[in-house]
UniProtKB/Swiss-Prot annotation:
Isoform 2 and isoform 3 are expressed in sperm. Isoform 1 is not detected in sperm (at protein level). Testis-specific. Isoform 1, isoform 2 and isoform 3 are expressed in sperm. Constitutively phosphorylated on serine, threonine and tyrosine residues within the head and tail regions of noncapacitated spermatozoa. Phosphorylation on tyrosine residues increases upon sperm capacitation within the acrosomal region in a protein kinase A (PKA)-dependent signaling pathway. Residues 263-285 have a biased composition (Low complexity). Residues 1-22 have a biased composition (Basic and acidic residues). Plays a role in the process of sperm capacitation and acrosome reactions. Probable receptor for the putative fertilization-promoting peptide (FPP) at the sperm membrane that may modulate the activity of the adenylyl cyclase cAMP pathway. This is T-complex protein 11 homolog. It comes from Homo sapiens. It is a single-pass membrane protein. Disulfide bonds: none annotated. It comes from the Eukaryota. InterPro entries: Tcp11.
Amino acid sequence: MPDVKESVPPKYPGDSEGRSCKPETSGPPQEDKSGSEDPPPFLSVTGLTETVNEVSKLSNKIGMNCDYYMEEKVLPPSSLEGKVKETVHNAFWDHLKEQLSATPPDFSCALELLKEIKEILLSLLLPRQNRLRIEIEEALDMDLLKQEAEHGALKVLYLSKYVLNMMALLCAPVRDEAVQKLENITDPVWLLRGIFQVLGRMKMDMVNYTIQSLQPHLQEHSIQYERAKFQELLNKQPSLLNHTTKWLTQAAGDLTMSPPTCPDTSDSSSVAGPSPNEAANNPEPLSPTMVLCQGFLNLLLWDLENEEFPETLLMDRTRLQELKSQLHQLTVMASVLLVASSFSGSVLFGSPQFVDKLKRITKSLLEDFHSRPEEAILTVSEQVSQEIHQSLKNMGLVALSSDNTASLMGQLQNIAKKENCVCSVIDQRIHLFLKCCLVLGVQRSLLDLPGGLTLIEAELAELGQKFVNLTHHNQQVFGPYYTEILKTLISPAQALETKVESV
């Protein structure tokens, strides 16, 4: 199964990474139809997770991300699998060279390759391209080619050049350069090898073009499919929504105790929420949408291995864990940048190049922060102070004194401590930003970033968009269930609305 990369693909046929010399057929994961026919009387969380996995993960990913596209997995050359694959492919192409160099030449492998090339070219055609279909069928008529091979008259190089011309007609603009490079190859074996490499990419381009074209239909299908599968489970076990109900009950309680606020874009000073007295005297009316937003935000603070994890989010548990890890990394990175900027000010941090370099260094050194926080942050403090010292020196400015350097390193190392005030403030502000993303959207939220977050704006935009995509898709799938639960949690006097609106 090809790996999935979430990014914006180009227009037809979309861009993708290279693949092996001989294309392999891959498709969406098959639904697991195993399991007993009679449902068990009780379904544990583990059992539920296994059952929910029956839902197509591919459908879920496509439905959640409108920029979804697929690419083949590129094996590291140093890996065992990569070495084995390269060895097998080299052996095949060496064998083909021996066959074509024999006297008389043996065209058996060449015929198989031409047959596969023909099938790939035909698969790249759109339904309306009948003229090209007929032309390919005639030019690569396998019966005729077999007769030529039997008489030793098969023109492999000539046929390869024809294939190249057809590829130039069918490929996306992003593949033009690769096809043009093949035109300079005169060795038939190397030419066929290159043809297969580029055709493999063109096949993936067509897959991504098809996904992009069908995106609206796939999204709607994904929503209906996931909801239907969940309803099947709910019919087997009526208590399936117990943990979801507890989760939303807690979110409603959090809002009742401390109503959430989100800065309005028209007032950049409204970063902080109302005071406790204002909140008590002027409680904001609850709405199902705000309760749900609070619930999603709470998940970023949860232990995601919690046995009472909401049933409606089990499919998203892994993605939530990734978002939580990314959020924590951004919290530490922003804290490092904020502390470092206080020692050099706008002199260095006014340079985007310097900030980007410092972010790259910090990010790479924080990879082990979760398992070895003190050691990781010590390395970060040494590298950051060294970069600041050297950059000031290169600009002809006064470098940090030994006292300032020691103070900088000390404050950076304190970031690894629990309840560090800088980290706590940054963490609260990132959560506030994510709340605003759910309410206002990512782009509007970026217009009014709280202090300390401007240096990680690009990273925040990526995090916010992933979070919005996840919550939006989940809400579209399970909205009817949430609406029914929230009716029991929000009294008519409290409610602003009676139905969950899309976040």
